[in-house]
From Swiss-Prot:
It is found in: Cytoplasm. Its main location: cytoplasm. It comes from Bacillus anthracis (strain CDC 684 / NRRL 3495). The gene is hisH. This is Imidazole glycerol phosphate synthase subunit HisH. GO terms for molecular function: glutaminase activity; imidazoleglycerol-phosphate synthase activity; lyase activity. Keywords: Amino-acid biosynthesis, Cytoplasm, Glutamine amidotransferase, Histidine biosynthesis, Hydrolase, Lyase. GO terms for biological process: L-histidine biosynthetic process. NCBIfam families: IMP_synth_hisH. InterPro entries: Class_I_gatase-like (IPR029062), GATASE (IPR017926), Imidazole-glycPsynth_HisH (IPR010139). CDD domains: GATase1_IGP_Synthase (cd01748). The active site is at C79 (nucleophile), H180, E182. The lineage of its organism: Bacteria, Bacillati, Bacillota, Bacilli, Bacillales. One of its GO terms (cellular component) is cytoplasm. HAMAP family: HisH.
Length: 209
């Protein structure tokens, strides 16, 4: 069972429809017990970083997400949800994040239209489980004005938008997509299927303990 965290700032319906399409068992929830009982977690998000962190604090979800991130349970952040995984953001004000990944969220300063909205090529950097069946140079769908300034060793996908935008990051059980896999057609569905596979593998490992 995958828990989609509903904290009032996510593109919940599109993520829900995508998981339904790939045949994944899921629940939409902000209940800590349900999230803890899940086999994997998706943290979506659209909006401002400081407001999102305030809401997660109000719902007492920050420490729980940090505990999940430090366990081996698969966690996928999407768009703003990915940005929240980092140490802090410069959006509107300096604001601490979940600190599960090293790096800072900074505003895009490029000679192009902001937000970066639409399809862009994703160049793979290294291999991870979520790349199975995903071709290098596939196009994915973005909507964002900020990007992750982070170490190269956690970057597994890059798009060019005047700067090298980390489109996909990963460290251990933690994954983050700056783009929207649920809006990225067959490629996005394949990545979500791969995440589902990672979740199922983790679940099987827990049953054997």
């Amino acid at each position: 069972m995958i828990a989609i965290i509903d904290y009032g700032m996510g593109n919940i319906r599109s993520v829900e429809q995508a998981l339904k399409y790939i045949g994944a068992a899921y629940i939409v929830t902000s209940d800590k017990e349900e999230i803890f009982r899940s086999d994997g977690v998706i943290l979506p998000g659209v909006g401002a970083f400081p407001k999102a962190m305030d809401i997660l604090e109000e719902k007492d979800l920050v420490r729980m997400l940090q505990e999940i991130g430090r366990s081996r349970k698969p966690l996928l952040g999407i768009c703003l949800g990915m940005q929240l995984l980092f140490e802090k953001s410069e959006e509107l004000q300096d604001c601490n994040g979940l600190s599960l990944l090293p790096g800072v969220i900074r505003k895009l300063k490029v000679p192009y239209k902001i937000p970066h909205m639409g399809w862009n090529e994703l160049k793979k950097e290294g291999e991870i489980a979520l790349w199975n069946g995903v071709e290098d140079g596939s196009f994915v769908y973005y909507v964002h004005s900020y990007y992750a300034d982070c170490p190269n060793e956690i970057v597994y996908g890059i798009s060019d938008y005047g700067v090298k935008v980390p489109g996909f990051v990963a460290k251990g059980n933690i994954y983050g997509a700056q783009f929207h896999p649920e809006k990225s057609g067959d490629i996005g569905m394949q990545m979500l299927k791969n995440f589902k596979g990672v979740v199922e593998t983790w679940k099987s490992s827990q049953l054997s303990i």
